[in-house]
């Protein structure tokens, strides 16, 4: 395992966490000031993993963001024998290192899309990057969806013209609820096991994916910050959030990885919305 690679990736994920939290708090402040309200602030709590490593949860429950969580973690140790066969390169001795950031935003307004994003770096006897971002609007708009996709396409095209179509397809396939035969949202990009043989290039790409999110999602939120919405629209949002919960508990790799490596349960389930309904 490469100590330098572990340090620079972990440092970047911490830096990205700080940038995201600062921008989301700024949005809270803009809205609260206009409405004469007290803005929400992120509350941080750290946790340690018995087998090695730990992380920091940052959660804000505000006036714009009903619940937004930004997690960073760096964990290491050995996979259980039952889990080794599922992770590339872990079948030899089970040793692993994983560092990353994961964030999920659930907005009060049903007109503003929910958003999920994560990027990570993992080492076993092999090493790779993974991650992506996806948008879940309750009332989809073509222009908004196109803008979200364009930001990630621009990041992808800097490195390989084949990245965006490949990663978009993987996102569409991954965020699909098989039991309901419907997509979770309008997609984005999703990549995993990325190792081109050039660590610096793959790391730079992963950084640009994070920067792409910062360039587009705050703008999407601000565009609808002051739009009025109805009780009926809120009710529909709560029902559609059920799909989000179903996916995360049934299919999400990150949820499974966290639970199988004895991660912090509250951090793992942070992605779940604070309020949800089933019809």
From Swiss-Prot:
Binding-site residues for a divalent metal cation, renumbered to this chain: 106, 116, 149, 179
Residues binding substrate, per UniProt: 102, 118-120
EC number(s) recorded for this UniProt protein: 1.3.3.3
Record field: catalytic activity: coproporphyrinogen III + O2 + 2 H(+) = protoporphyrinogen IX + 2 CO2 + 2 H2O
Xref: SUPFAM superfamilies: Coproporphyrinogen III oxidase
An MF annotation (GO) of this entry: metal ion binding
InterPro entries from the UniProt entry: Coprogen_oxidase_aer, Coprogen_oxidase_aer_sf, Coprogen_oxidase_CS
Pathway where it operates: Porphyrin-containing compound metabolism; protoporphyrin-IX biosynthesis; protoporphyrinogen-IX from coproporphyrinogen-III (O2 route): step 1/1
UniProt entry tagged with the keyword Oxidoreductase: yes
UniProt keyword annotation of Oxidoreductase present: yes
Enzyme class, spelled out: oxidoreductase
Sites marked Important for dimerization: 179
Record key words, sorted: Cytoplasm, Heme biosynthesis, Metal-binding, Oxidoreductase, Porphyrin biosynthesis
Function: Involved in the heme biosynthesis. Catalyzes the aerobic oxidative decarboxylation of propionate groups of rings A and B of coproporphyrinogen-III to yield the vinyl groups in protoporphyrinogen-IX.
HAMAP family, alphabetized: Coprogen_oxidas
Stated name of the protein: Oxygen-dependent coproporphyrinogen-III oxidase
Organism of derivation: Rickettsia bellii (strain RML369-C)
């Amino acid at each position: 395992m490469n100590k330098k690679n572990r340090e620079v990736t972990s440092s970047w994920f911490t830096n990205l966490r700080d940038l995201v939290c600062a921008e989301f708090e700024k949005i809270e402040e803009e809205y609260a000031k206009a409405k004469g309200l007290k803005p929400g602030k992120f509350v941080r709590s750290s946790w340690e993993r018995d087998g090695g490593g730990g992380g920091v949860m940052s959660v804000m429950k505000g006036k714009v963001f009903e619940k937004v969580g930004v997690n960073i973690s760096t964990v290491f140790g050995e996979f259980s024998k039952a889990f080794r066969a599922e992770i590339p390169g872990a079948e030899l001795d089970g040793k692993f290192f994983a560092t990353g950031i994961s964030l999920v935003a659930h907005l009060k307004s049903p007109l503003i899309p929910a958003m999920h994003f994560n990027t990570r770096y993992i080492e076993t006897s092999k090493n790779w990057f993974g991650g992506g971002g996806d948008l879940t609007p309750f009332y989809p708009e073509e222009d908004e969806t196109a803008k979200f996709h364009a930001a990630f396409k621009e990041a992808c095209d800097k490195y390989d013209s084949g990245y965006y179509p490949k990663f978009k397809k993987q996102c569409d396939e991954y965020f699909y609820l098989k039991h309901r035969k419907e997509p979770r949202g309008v997609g984005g990009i999703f990549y995993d096991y990325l190792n081109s043989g050039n660590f610096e290039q793959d790391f730079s790409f992963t950084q640009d994916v994070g920067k792409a999110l910062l360039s587009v999602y705050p703008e999407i939120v601000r565009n609808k910050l002051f739009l009025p919405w109805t009780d009926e629209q809120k009710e529909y949002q709560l029902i559609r959030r059920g799909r989000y919960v179903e996916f995360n508990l049934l299919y999400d790799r990150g949820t499974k990885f966290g639970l199988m490596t004895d991660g912090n349960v509250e951090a793992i389930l942070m992605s779940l919305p604070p309020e949800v309904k089933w019809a």
